[in-house]
């Protein structure tokens, strides 16, 4: 039996009054809405009662007690703020007598923020009334007092294109600047190949044919591959990763800042790098025709793609060709290894796509010509790599790996940061080719470390919870994607049934919805000091090894791997000499603080993903600001007490048809079936329903799209 709530122009509970009482204190995360606030706890989500809203901000961790309201609703009473999420606020500067006032850009904030009379930050930075600014919070608001801030920087007028992005950066505590001490340390670094090769662990691979394949607009290249067919019909795959650990010493200025950031953050209009550009875009970037230090994993596989042997070691490489994914795919199509998908849509869109493919082929042919200078047929190289990728994908599928087919929706911006197009970057044969190589290298390194019982930053993906799987199974069955037998298998966590559901929806209008439903039922992957396996990959051992330029856990893995190699191949005395630079010594050494590092990396990854998503939503909202009143076809992708979320066919962008806009009748929300049903007319809205909407309103600060249902 579904848990039902009845709604008319918003949420409302029809149960009678019950006795009000406080329940024991809980902690949770604040989630602000336009006219309400919720606390998300392990025990459920609770709406915040009126008092206390002034002192909380989105993302804060708070202590609450749960109180039954006179209408029977369980409400959260704020007992105190445990941890603040934001250290800055973005808003418009105004004056009120001797005080400066910051009017927050986030209309959900109920508190005021003042600049004290003695604060000269506005004059010092040339800020005038009406300017948008980033202000650092000095004291947080309470129920009785406003917050105090000081201006850190002027953004510009309130119509600045990056105003929303600056808001997100302030919300998550991100900055464009990098500490001077770390920058100075980076400028003092240099590459000395001769000195590096004196290390007996490092091997010279500069005579090996190595290539990089990345997005066409990539600026840093931290992974490369080499591949040879063996006489027995198998493969020798080399995965070569930038050797960041050679340059970044434990507890140095760069390391401390990288450990604080833990990840590069990819916002819609900029990248906030984990490492200084001197490293990420220069010394550690595997650019063509330049000697670079790398960490290599050589993997020998048989003709069926099964691993027979692997060997990790530091190296020196020289990339010969820099390819992009589209160019690589064009060569694979030309070789007959794969086919392009059929182009659909308006004539001008098809024409533009065809032109793009022709340009990609030209880039691919230029790379092919460069490879001939090394007596390598690049087409054959890519065909072999594609064959191996397909073999590895089959092996993963056979052992229970689940491949979710999701597209990355992003806004393309002009040089001023104004969105000009919405694109969906989907997986291609070329991206899969590299992805499979990186997955395999990660597995091999994790197994190498786990076999020796070595602690590191392992990537752990736990089994999904039965409750989450049950909800997804019910929704998929209602969509007609799966039958009852398959639903039962999904509810039990069968990887085969999960993959079958993804495959059944592939190529249909429901494919994005199915993938979203199943992804929501998964646990989030975490970093842990001990290996616990990876559910989605069906991998007994897994870690991140392949992106130390942008992920701190990868740098940790490189360090412990290099130290263990020294111990095994050169002896304990040599390893002892390397220890301070690689992992430190004493109370603040890597082994002592590894659990904290793993937790910090997991938390920072979650925040970076959220910030990236938020800025893309902002740019997408800016794109649709000029398209108010336009109508589009879409699919109901989610149903809640707030209304219907609709994903547009053309761009895969999602917006809300609020329950207020559906009419004046009562709507009954079935939380289990995920439906809204009109009490008077019986009109029913459900997942997967095809609709036509009109863009009715946009919020470019928070990246929200409001739709009006047409039919």
Regions found by a protein language model. Give the residues of each.
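Charge-lined substrate channels and their catalytic hotspots, especially those that engage the 3′ end
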Residues: 2-238, 245-294, 320-323, 327-330, ...
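Feature marking long nucleic-acid-engaging regions of large polymerase/nuclease enzymes
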Residues: 3, 118-120, 135, 153, ...
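Structured C-terminal cores of nucleic-acid metabolism proteins
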Residues: 23, 444, 462, 466-470, ...
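Short, surface-exposed charged micro-motifs
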Residues: 27-29, 92, 224-226, 298, ...
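Short acidic/polar mixed-charge low-complexity motifs
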Residues: 44-46, 98, 107-110, 233-234, ...
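A residue-level signal for conserved active-site and pocket-lining positions in enzyme catalytic cores
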Residues: 59, 130, 151, 213, ...
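Conserved nucleotide-binding/hydrolysis micro-motifs of P-loop NTPases
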Residues: 69-70, 139-142, 157, 244-246, ...
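Helical mechanochemical/support elements of P-loop NTPase systems and associated helical scaffolds
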Residues: 74, 144-147, 161, 209, ...
């Amino acid at each position: 039996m579904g848990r039902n709530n009845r709604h008319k122009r918003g949420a409302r509970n029809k149960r009678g009054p019950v006795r009000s009482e406080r329940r024991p204190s809980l902690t949770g995360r604040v989630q602000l809405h336009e006219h309400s606030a919720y606390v998300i706890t392990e025990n459920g989500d609770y709406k915040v009662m009126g008092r206390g809203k002034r002192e909380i901000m989105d993302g804060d961790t708070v202590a609450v007690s749960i109180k039954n309201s006179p209408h029977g609703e369980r409400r959260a009473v704020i007992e105190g703020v445990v941890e603040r999420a934001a250290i800055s606020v973005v808003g418009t500067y105004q004056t009120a007598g001797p005080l400066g006032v910051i009017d927050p850009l986030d209309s959900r904030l109920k508190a005021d923020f003042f600049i004290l009379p003695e604060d000269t930050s506005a004059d010092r930075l040339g800020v005038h009334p009406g300017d948008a600014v980033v202000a650092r919070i000095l004291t947080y608001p309470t129920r009785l007092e406003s917050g105090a801030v000081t201006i850190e920087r002027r953004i510009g007028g309130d119509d600045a294109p990056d105003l929303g992005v600056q808001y997100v950066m302030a919300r998550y505590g991100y900055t464009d600047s990098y500490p001077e001490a770390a920058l100075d340390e980076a400028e003092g670094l240099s590459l000395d190949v001769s000195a590096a090769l004196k290390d007996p662990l490092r091997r010279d691979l500069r005579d090996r044919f190595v290539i990089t394949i990345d997005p066409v607009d990539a600026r840093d290249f931290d992974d490369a591959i080499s591949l040879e067919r063996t006489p027995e019909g198998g493969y020798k795959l080399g995965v070569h990763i930038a050797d960041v650990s050679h340059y970044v010493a434990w507890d140095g200025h760069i390391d401390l800042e990288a450990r604080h950031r833990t990840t590069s953050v990819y916002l819609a209009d900029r990248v906030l790098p984990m490492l200084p550009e001197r490293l990420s875009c220069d010394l550690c970037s595997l650019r063509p025709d330049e000697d670079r230090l790398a960490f290599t994993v050589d993997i020998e596989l048989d003709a069926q793609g099964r691993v027979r042997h692997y060997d990790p070691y530091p190296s020196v490489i020289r990339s010969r060709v820099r390819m992009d994914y589209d160019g690589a795919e064009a060569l694979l199509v030309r070789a007959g290894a794969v086919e392009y998908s059929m182009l659909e849509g308006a004539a001008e869109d098809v024409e533009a796509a065809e032109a793009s493919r022709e340009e990609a082929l030209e880039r691919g042919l230029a790379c092919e010509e460069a490879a001939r200078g090394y007596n390598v047929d690049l087409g054959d190289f890519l065909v072999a790599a594609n064959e191996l990728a397909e073999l590895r994908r089959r092996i993963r599928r056979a052992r229970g790996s689940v491949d979710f087919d999701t597209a990355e929706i992003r806004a393309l911006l002009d040089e001023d940061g104004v969105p000009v197009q919405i694109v969906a970057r989907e997986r291609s044969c070329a991206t899969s080719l590299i992805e499979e190589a990186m997955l395999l290298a990660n597995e091999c390194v994790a197994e190498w470390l786990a076999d020796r019982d070595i602690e590191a930053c392992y990537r752990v993906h736990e089994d999904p919870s039965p409750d989450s799987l049950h909800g997804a199974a019910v929704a998929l069955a209602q969509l007609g994607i799966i039958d009852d037998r398959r639903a039962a298998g999904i509810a039990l966590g069968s990887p085969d049934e999960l993959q079958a559901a993804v495959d059944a929806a592939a190529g249909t209008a429901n494919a994005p919805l199915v993938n979203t439903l199943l992804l929501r039922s998964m646990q989030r992957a975490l970093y842990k000091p001990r290996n616990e396996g990876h559910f989605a990959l069906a991998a007994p051992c897994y870690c991140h090894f392949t992106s130390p330029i942008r992920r701190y856990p990868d740098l940790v893995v490189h360090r412990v791997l290099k130290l263990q190699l020294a111990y095994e191949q050169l002896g304990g005395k040599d390893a002892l000499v390397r220890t301070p630079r690689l992992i430190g010594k004493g109370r603040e050494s890597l082994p002592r603080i590894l659990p904290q590092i793993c937790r910090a990396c997991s938390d920072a990854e979650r925040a970076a993903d959220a910030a990236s998503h938020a800025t893309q939503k902002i740019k997408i909202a800016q794109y649709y600001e000029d398209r108010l009143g336009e109508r589009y076809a879409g699919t109901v992708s989610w149903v809640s007490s707030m209304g219907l979320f609709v994903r547009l066919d053309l761009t895969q962008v999602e917006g809300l048809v609020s329950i207020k806009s559906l009419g004046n009748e009562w709507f009954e929300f079935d939380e289990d079936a995920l439906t809204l049903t009109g009490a008077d007319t019986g009109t029913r809205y459900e997942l997967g329903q095809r609709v036509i909407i009109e863009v009715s309103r946009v919020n470019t600060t928070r990246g929200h799209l409001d739709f009006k249902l047409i039919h």
